[in-house]
Amino acid sequence: MMPVVQDRKAQICALLKSIETGEPEPIAVFNQQQYIQHNPHTQEGSEGLEELFKRLSQTSPRVNIVRAFEDGDYVFAHTEYDFVRSNIGFGVFRFENDHVVEHWDNIQPRQDPNISGLTLVEGPSEATDHNLTETNRQTVSAFVETVLVRRQFAQLEDHFEGSELIQHNPQLSNGVKAFRAALEERNGAGFTIEYPRLHRVLAEGNFVLSVSEGSRNDVHSSFYDLFRLSKGKLAEHWGTIEDIPPHSAWKNDNGKF
């Protein structure tokens, strides 16, 4: 008999939805003996995942998985969470064989639409151009390393098709000009950002997620940036920024990244 091939994206979507429903079955995708949690606000071993999800479901949450992608042993999802307050988050799950053994995330509060009328989540959700996955990964890696990390802004426009960029950052408007002004700290948006380190780049087709460490207004922060590419150029951008608490406040010792 041939082994059953599990749809990892479907498993993760069911898992995330079980936060809302309290259903215990999707939690079986975790290997709870090997599971490594990188959310510094979550304590390992304090309660089983089944009990945790059941408790969360009693708060009447709503969970909407906007888009999900798969890259080798990784699944990454872009999700709306409504608990006590409304949040937007990226979750990254690493599989070993049939089970999740590691998890990272980056969450920020939902905000009003930006000046271009766009929210943190709307837009295309299905990956295309799967034959270009590695090319697109390299394109985003080069952009992050060159423009965001090394701050070589003269090369920024090389990564876009003319002046076009669909921008979902709540502080920015559409267009490459507004993006460059924000990076150069001359846009009047009231924030400064630095990206000294790129940790991970995940990709499926024309969607690429970069995971970076840096600071916002001199506060240690994590940056998850999702790009949609078209014809080899960056065409659309979503992201979340989350403050990283001081090590003394961490509830596990696994690190944010």
For the regions a protein language model found, what residue spans apply to each?
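C-terminal and inter-domain tail/linker signature
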Residues: M1-F257
